[in-house]
Amino acid sequence: MVDDETLSVAQKIECLLRLAVKSSREEMTLIRLYHEMSSIGNQNLMYKLPRSMELFTAERYVKMLEEGQKKGEVRPELDARLAAFSMDNIFLSLQFAYACDYYRIRFQLYNHPEIDKEEYDEKVISETFQILKGALLVPDMSERD
């Protein structure tokens, strides 16, 4: 979806948010495993893991935002690499909030005890989408979608 040139950056971001929430429910064990693998103290694994697991995604997010800047969709003053990193951190935090106990508790404390239930997914997606649109997209473009 990130490489789909028929979609606007706003549409791609919304699709990615939906995927983050859906995959957190469907692949909870994998999300937890990723969290465990990325937070252990094994130095060799720490240096290999981000490169092997994150490079593919990082390159696509940066490309998506840079192309969006060229098309006038993404704020031109942003560093696309730092913006991609920040956007991915939001996606990652959402995934952990649904799959990992500590992050779920934080999610609930900031919101309410049932925020991680499926009935609230649209609210979570919509609100997070508004935050990302405001941070990343040119105002006229973010109002379009």
Locate each region found by the language model.
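Short, hydrophobic secondary-structure boundary micro-motifs
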Residues: R32-Y34, Y47, E77, F107, ...
